[in-house]
Protein backbone atom coordinates (compact mmCIF):
# COMPACT_ATOMS: atom_id res chain seq x y z
CA UNK A 1 0.00 0.00 0.00
CA UNK A 2 2.76 2.46 0.96
CA UNK A 3 4.76 1.59 -2.15
CA UNK A 4 1.65 2.17 -4.27
CA UNK A 5 1.14 5.62 -2.74
CA UNK A 6 4.80 6.54 -3.26
CA UNK A 7 4.52 5.55 -6.91
CA UNK A 8 1.31 7.59 -7.11
CA UNK A 9 3.06 10.61 -5.57
CA UNK A 10 5.89 10.35 -8.09
CA UNK A 11 3.38 9.98 -10.91
CA UNK A 12 1.15 12.93 -10.01
CA UNK A 13 4.14 15.23 -9.49
CA UNK A 14 5.80 13.93 -12.70
CA UNK A 15 9.11 13.46 -10.92
CA UNK A 16 9.60 10.45 -13.16
CA UNK A 17 9.38 12.76 -16.20
CA UNK A 18 11.88 15.56 -15.49
CA UNK A 19 11.72 17.19 -18.93
CA UNK A 20 9.08 19.60 -17.58
CA UNK A 21 11.50 20.65 -14.84
CA UNK A 22 14.20 21.32 -17.43
CA UNK A 23 11.80 23.44 -19.51
CA UNK A 24 11.16 25.58 -16.44
CA UNK A 25 14.71 25.54 -15.13
CA UNK A 26 16.68 26.43 -18.27
CA UNK A 27 15.03 29.85 -18.77
CA UNK A 28 15.35 30.51 -15.03
CA UNK A 29 19.09 29.81 -15.10
CA UNK A 30 19.52 32.03 -18.16
CA UNK A 31 17.58 34.78 -16.39
CA UNK A 32 19.76 34.35 -13.30
CA UNK A 33 22.94 34.54 -15.38
CA UNK A 34 21.80 37.71 -17.19
CA UNK A 35 20.26 39.51 -14.21
CA UNK A 36 23.34 38.98 -12.03
CA UNK A 37 25.77 39.67 -14.89
CA UNK A 38 27.28 36.22 -14.27
CA UNK A 39 27.90 37.01 -10.57
CA UNK A 40 25.48 34.40 -9.30
CA UNK A 41 24.53 34.21 -5.62
CA UNK A 42 24.47 30.59 -4.53
CA UNK A 43 21.42 31.17 -2.35
CA UNK A 44 19.53 32.40 -5.41
CA UNK A 45 20.77 29.43 -7.43
CA UNK A 46 19.37 27.03 -4.83
CA UNK A 47 16.02 28.87 -4.84
CA UNK A 48 15.86 28.68 -8.63
CA UNK A 49 16.65 24.96 -8.81
CA UNK A 50 14.44 23.85 -5.91
CA UNK A 51 11.73 26.29 -6.95
CA UNK A 52 11.62 24.92 -10.49
CA UNK A 53 11.07 21.41 -9.14
CA UNK A 54 8.41 22.47 -6.63
CA UNK A 55 6.49 24.77 -8.97
CA UNK A 56 6.42 22.27 -11.81
CA UNK A 57 5.21 19.52 -9.48
CA UNK A 58 2.58 21.81 -7.94
CA UNK A 59 1.27 22.73 -11.37
CA UNK A 60 1.05 19.08 -12.39
CA UNK A 61 -0.94 18.17 -9.28
CA UNK A 62 -3.53 20.94 -9.63
CA UNK A 63 -3.80 20.19 -13.35
CA UNK A 64 -4.59 16.53 -12.62
CA UNK A 65 -7.15 17.51 -9.98
CA UNK A 66 -9.07 19.73 -12.37
CA UNK A 67 -8.70 17.39 -15.36
CA UNK A 68 -9.36 14.09 -13.61
CA UNK A 69 -12.58 13.31 -15.48
CA UNK A 70 -11.11 14.35 -18.84
CA UNK A 71 -7.95 12.32 -18.21
CA UNK A 72 -10.02 9.17 -17.81
CA UNK A 73 -11.20 9.52 -21.42
CA UNK A 74 -7.85 10.31 -23.04
CA UNK A 75 -5.53 7.48 -24.04
CA UNK A 76 -2.34 9.30 -23.03
CA UNK A 77 -3.60 10.31 -19.58
CA UNK A 78 -5.98 7.55 -18.49
CA UNK A 79 -3.28 5.85 -16.38
CA UNK A 80 -2.38 8.95 -14.35
CA UNK A 81 -2.68 8.38 -10.57
CA UNK A 82 -5.95 10.29 -10.12
CA UNK A 83 -7.61 9.11 -13.32
CA UNK A 84 -6.73 5.48 -12.61
CA UNK A 85 -7.74 5.61 -8.94
CA UNK A 86 -4.22 5.06 -7.63
CA UNK A 87 -4.62 8.22 -5.55
CA UNK A 88 -7.79 9.76 -4.15
CA UNK A 89 -8.75 13.37 -4.75
CA UNK A 90 -8.25 14.10 -1.04
CA UNK A 91 -4.70 12.74 -1.23
CA UNK A 92 -4.04 14.87 -4.30
CA UNK A 93 -5.26 18.00 -2.49
CA UNK A 94 -2.99 17.15 0.44
CA UNK A 95 0.00 16.84 -1.91
CA UNK A 96 -0.93 20.14 -3.54
CA UNK A 97 -1.15 21.84 -0.13
CA UNK A 98 2.20 20.36 0.94
CA UNK A 99 3.93 21.55 -2.23
CA UNK A 100 2.31 24.99 -2.01
CA UNK A 101 3.50 25.47 1.57
CA UNK A 102 6.98 24.37 0.50
CA UNK A 103 6.95 27.03 -2.22
CA UNK A 104 5.88 29.67 0.30
CA UNK A 105 8.67 28.68 2.66
CA UNK A 106 11.20 28.84 -0.17
CA UNK A 107 10.41 32.48 -0.98
CA UNK A 108 9.73 33.62 2.59
CA UNK A 109 13.10 35.38 2.92
CA UNK A 110 12.92 37.22 -0.41
CA UNK A 111 12.18 40.92 -0.77
CA UNK A 112 8.62 42.15 -1.10
CA UNK A 113 8.64 42.60 -4.88
CA UNK A 114 9.68 39.05 -5.85
CA UNK A 115 7.21 37.68 -3.30
CA UNK A 116 4.38 39.61 -4.98
CA UNK A 117 5.51 38.43 -8.41
CA UNK A 118 5.52 34.85 -7.10
CA UNK A 119 2.02 35.30 -5.69
CA UNK A 120 0.73 36.68 -9.00
CA UNK A 121 2.06 33.74 -10.98
CA UNK A 122 0.83 31.28 -8.35
CA UNK A 123 -2.72 32.36 -9.15
CA UNK A 124 -2.05 31.91 -12.87
CA UNK A 125 -0.66 28.41 -12.31
CA UNK A 126 -3.78 27.36 -10.40
CA UNK A 127 -6.06 28.99 -12.96
CA UNK A 128 -4.33 27.57 -16.06
CA UNK A 129 -6.03 24.12 -16.11
CA UNK A 130 -9.42 25.84 -16.20
CA UNK A 131 -8.50 27.89 -19.28
CA UNK A 132 -8.60 24.71 -21.36
CA UNK A 133 -12.37 24.75 -20.84
CA UNK A 134 -13.06 28.14 -22.41
CA UNK A 135 -9.98 29.34 -24.32
CA UNK A 136 -9.55 28.14 -27.89
CA UNK A 137 -5.77 28.45 -27.59
CA UNK A 138 -4.81 27.73 -23.96
CA UNK A 139 -1.19 27.49 -25.07
CA UNK A 140 -1.09 31.30 -25.01
CA UNK A 141 -2.06 31.36 -21.34
CA UNK A 142 0.48 28.63 -20.64
CA UNK A 143 3.12 30.74 -22.38
CA UNK A 144 2.39 33.62 -20.01
CA UNK A 145 2.29 31.34 -16.96
CA UNK A 146 5.12 28.89 -17.56
CA UNK A 147 7.59 31.71 -18.13
CA UNK A 148 7.07 32.82 -14.52
CA UNK A 149 10.62 32.01 -13.50
CA UNK A 150 12.04 34.79 -15.68
CA UNK A 151 10.32 37.82 -14.06
CA UNK A 152 10.66 36.17 -10.65
CA UNK A 153 14.44 35.80 -11.04
CA UNK A 154 14.87 39.32 -12.41
CA UNK A 155 12.79 40.75 -9.55
CA UNK A 156 14.99 38.86 -7.07
CA UNK A 157 17.87 40.95 -8.41
CA UNK A 158 15.88 44.21 -8.51
CA UNK A 159 15.63 44.25 -12.32
CA UNK A 160 11.99 43.40 -12.95
CA UNK A 161 11.56 46.11 -15.59
CA UNK A 162 14.91 45.56 -17.28
CA UNK A 163 14.64 45.39 -21.09
CA UNK A 164 16.54 42.10 -21.21
CA UNK A 165 13.89 40.55 -18.96
CA UNK A 166 11.10 41.37 -21.42
CA UNK A 167 13.12 40.15 -24.40
CA UNK A 168 13.85 36.83 -22.69
CA UNK A 169 10.26 36.51 -21.45
CA UNK A 170 8.85 37.09 -24.96
CA UNK A 171 11.28 34.60 -26.52
CA UNK A 172 10.36 32.01 -23.90
CA UNK A 173 6.65 32.76 -24.46
CA UNK A 174 6.99 31.90 -28.17
CA UNK A 175 9.03 28.79 -27.37
CA UNK A 176 6.38 27.50 -24.95
CA UNK A 177 3.55 28.02 -27.45
CA UNK A 178 5.54 26.14 -30.10
CA UNK A 179 6.38 23.04 -28.05
CA UNK A 180 3.03 22.86 -26.24
CA UNK A 181 1.12 23.08 -29.53
CA UNK A 182 3.17 20.17 -30.85
CA UNK A 183 2.53 18.30 -27.59
CA UNK A 184 -1.23 18.96 -27.86
CA UNK A 185 -1.37 17.28 -31.26
CA UNK A 186 -0.82 13.91 -29.60
CA UNK A 187 -4.32 14.24 -28.08
CA UNK A 188 -5.96 15.49 -31.27
CA UNK A 189 -8.17 12.44 -31.88
CA UNK A 190 -9.40 12.46 -28.27
CA UNK A 191 -10.09 16.20 -28.48
CA UNK A 192 -12.38 15.58 -31.45
CA UNK A 193 -14.43 13.21 -29.31
CA UNK A 194 -14.86 15.48 -26.28
CA UNK A 195 -14.33 19.07 -27.45
CA UNK A 196 -15.10 21.09 -30.57
CA UNK A 197 -13.28 22.81 -32.12
CA UNK A 198 -9.82 21.75 -30.99
CA UNK A 199 -7.02 24.20 -30.16
CA UNK A 200 -5.03 22.90 -33.11
CA UNK A 201 -7.86 23.80 -35.50
CA UNK A 202 -7.62 27.41 -34.32
CA UNK A 203 -4.01 27.51 -35.42
Give each language-model segment a name.
Residues 1-7:
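Transit-peptide-like, low-complexity N-terminal presequences
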Residues 7-11, 50, 80-163, 167:
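Intramembrane alpha-helical segments
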Residues 7-19, 196:
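Membrane interfacial helix-start motif at the N-side
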Residues 194-203:
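Single conserved hydrophobic/aromatic residue that forms the stacking wall/gate
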Amino acid sequence: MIAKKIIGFIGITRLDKPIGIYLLLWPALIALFISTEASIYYSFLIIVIVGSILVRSTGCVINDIFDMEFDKKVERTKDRPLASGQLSKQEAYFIFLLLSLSCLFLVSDLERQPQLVCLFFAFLIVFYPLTKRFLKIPQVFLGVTFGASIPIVFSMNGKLFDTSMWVLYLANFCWIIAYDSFYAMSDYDDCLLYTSPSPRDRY
